[in-house]
Amino acid sequence: MTTTITLICFGGLAALSPEGQPMPLELDLPATAADLKVAIARACDLMPDSALAQLLQKSAIGSETRIYIDSDLIPASLSHLALLPPVSGG
């Protein structure tokens, strides 16, 4: 089964989506959060050793109600997800 998920990219990951707009992505289900990151990298033609690809791998994937770790399955019912890069504060 394939679903379309709209990705909202924050911080340095905003460079993945044209003009900072939400980015639609076709995803084959079942898929984990790690599978989603691979699909994003492919869709954006990221070289594995690029800074943006490395940032994507360190980033969290979130919905309105939770954060998904790499081993979590992405529910078929989700239509929007956020890409959240690591941040530091002080």
Swiss-Prot record:
<feature type="modified residue" description="1-thioglycine; alternate">
    <location>
        <position position="90"/>
    </location>
</feature>
<dbReference type="GO" id="GO:0000166">
    <property type="term" value="F:nucleotide binding"/>
</dbReference>
<protein>
    <recommendedName>
        <fullName>Molybdopterin synthase sulfur carrier subunit</fullName>
    </recommendedName>
</protein>
<keyword id="KW-0597">Phosphoprotein</keyword>
<keyword id="KW-0547">Nucleotide-binding</keyword>
<keyword id="KW-0501">Molybdenum cofactor biosynthesis</keyword>
<comment type="similarity">
    <text>Belongs to the MoaD family.</text>
</comment>
<comment type="pathway">
    <text>Cofactor biosynthesis; molybdopterin biosynthesis.</text>
</comment>
<dbReference type="GO" id="GO:0006777">
    <property type="term" value="P:Mo-molybdopterin cofactor biosynthetic process"/>
</dbReference>
<feature type="modified residue" description="Glycyl adenylate; alternate">
    <location>
        <position position="90"/>
    </location>
</feature>
<comment type="subunit">
    <text>Heterotetramer of 2 MoaD subunits and 2 MoaE subunits. Forms a stable heterotetrameric complex of 2 MoaD and 2 MoeB during adenylation of MoaD by MoeB. During catalysis MoaD shuttles between the two heterotetrameric complexes.</text>
</comment>
<comment type="function">
    <text>Involved in sulfur transfer in the conversion of molybdopterin precursor Z to molybdopterin.</text>
</comment>
